[in-house]
């Protein structure tokens, strides 16, 4: 409680004034002047502020690294202009994606109908459900790009890539929807497949895992980059392999060719996620990354060996589990960490996917096609008469 000090009564006796040593002294604005009530309140509030605020200062200094500590996420007033290029490796990834552009209209599905009719019921069941997962998952990837990554990342080169990735994911989703629309004639079954996130528990489980990362406000950008590298690198891997298995059997040329194009694009998107991870100053720990990757592996293994077993199309479930682990190890290495499972690739036909194809360009467009001149340097496009032959 604040105490009020009563001011000294004025001295009126002339004799006292003569004897007083305080005669002629002014006490106004001196240190020993009793403070007024308003001044006392100010002093009390300042003291209280010091008492309650000072202990919190060390906590502020020791806080976790924020956006300002990450060059990728820091406010960038020059983000509206592309040149001059600052991150050349990220820009090259964008140009590589741009050179790989394709559209759904370029895929010939005319031979697929006859093949589809000749497939066993369990093979048709498997393919249709894999396509349903793919059609929904590309939309989820785009949701993350639009809602989170494109808004968080401030460097122009990465924003260019994310913008182009959004366009390509739309084309992938269109392609998968077109495949379902072409193969499935029953309207009710078609509707069931288009709403796979709601109608198919095995697809919903994978979708929920990805959607949870989009909505997680506590997870760092680095953790979410790893999670979506797992979505595009692990969640898609087994399904891609199962469709390439059909190619090995000479089935469904339109489906398998679109699978080549899409798997190449998703591989590039996964590589880009790893590149962004490498540019981070404050990365998640290896233990945290392993936890995210292993979680994704378990969900994908369950999806393709229990919920939608690959044995339906004649593949070995045990080998599929091993292949998913092999893909996860490759992703861990690309992120800069050590392998988790240390297994070999059990599918020899998947080794050829990374090699340059020898397809006759005049028979059909090759899966490793790139647009003319996009990846070449200015000097490569110049005309000269003194070139060496």
Curated annotation (Swiss-Prot):
GO terms for biological process: 2'-deoxyribonucleotide biosynthetic process; blastocyst development; deoxyribonucleotide biosynthetic process; positive regulation of G1/S transition of mitotic cell cycle; protein heterotetramerization; ribonucleoside diphosphate metabolic process. Phosphorylation on Ser-20 relieves the inhibitory effect on Wnt signaling. Phosphorylated on Thr-33 by CDK1 and CDK2; predominantly in G2 and M phase. It holds the Pfam family Ribonuc_red_sm. The keyword Cytoplasm applies. PROSITE patterns: RIBORED_SMALL. The active site is at 176. Binds 2 iron ions per subunit. Fe cation 2 binds at residues 169, 232, 266, 269. One of its GO terms (cellular component) is ribonucleoside-diphosphate reductase complex. Induction: Up-regulated in response to DNA damage induced by doxorubicin, camptothecin, UV-C, methyl methanesulfonate, nocodazole, or gamma-irradiation. The modification Phosphothreonine is found at residue 33. This is Ribonucleoside-diphosphate reductase subunit M2. The gene is RRM2.
